[in-house]
């Protein structure tokens, strides 16, 4: 056996008891592991996640307690309170067994995040006339992370116990 393949996938769609609020998300994660001889293997993978949902900040207060309204009431604007994120990541892991309990492992990951969120929500407590002030914000950002880790481990027995020694970068 010199290769193994795997595909993880998920999807979810959910409504809320609040009027106008919902959530949809899905993800895929194909991976493959290739044997490069008897002592070395490389695993390559990709992850994609998409998440879209209504941002719900809950109920405003009135006289120090939650405002008395039906549980399905959305305070703010559900149509303008959305959050979206997309995550794409590539990774590679190289494992090599030297023998006698000595192992080298290098992990690399590059991930890009694209996020947007916006919310129209109660910006004040409900006043005695039954009114409140709405507030709003939005934010968008993109970020790319690069990660690399190298570990050298050695398993030894000493003092009646098995130990793992670790050196890494």
Where are these regions (language model features)?
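Extracytoplasmic loops and strand-loop junctions of Gram-negative outer membrane beta-barrel proteins
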Residues: 12-15, 69-79, 129-138
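Residue-level preference for alpha-helix termini and adjacent loops
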Residues: 2, 16, 20-22, 101, ...
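Outer-membrane beta-barrel and related beta-rich outer-membrane complex signature
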Residues: 19-21, 41-76, 110, 114-124, ...
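Short linear motifs at secondary-structure transitions and domain/linker junctions
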Residues: 6-8, 66-70, 79-81, 126-128, ...
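Extended alpha-helical regions
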Residues: 29-31, 71-125
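Face-selective signature of the C-terminal outer-membrane beta-barrel domain
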Residues: 86, 90-113, 136-169
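A short linear-motif detector with a strong N-terminal bias
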Residues: 20-22, 82-84, 130-131, 144-150
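Transmembrane beta-barrel wall of Gram-negative outer-membrane proteins
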Residues: 1-54, 82-93
């Amino acid at each position: 056996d010199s290769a193994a393949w795997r595909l993880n996938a998920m999807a979810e769609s959910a409504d809320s008891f609040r009027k106008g609020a919902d959530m949809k998300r899905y993800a895929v994660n194909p991976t493959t592991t290739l044997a490069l001889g008897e002592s070395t293997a490389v695993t390559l993978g990709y992850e994609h996640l998409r998440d879209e949902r209504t941002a719900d900040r809950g109920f405003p207060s009135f006289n120090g307690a939650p405002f008395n309204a039906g549980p399905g009431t959305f305070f703010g604007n559900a149509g303008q309170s959305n959050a979206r994120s997309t995550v794409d990541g590539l990774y590679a892991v190289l494992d090599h067994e030297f023998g006698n309990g000595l192992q080298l492992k290098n992990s690399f990951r590059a991930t890009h995040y694209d996020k947007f969120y916006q919310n129209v929500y109660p910006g004040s407590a409900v006043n005695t006339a039954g009114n409140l002030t709405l507030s709003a914000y939005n934010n968008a950002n993109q970020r790319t992370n690069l990660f690399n880790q190298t570990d050298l481990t050695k398993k030894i027995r000493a003092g009646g116990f098995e130990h793992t020694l670790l050196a890494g970068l």
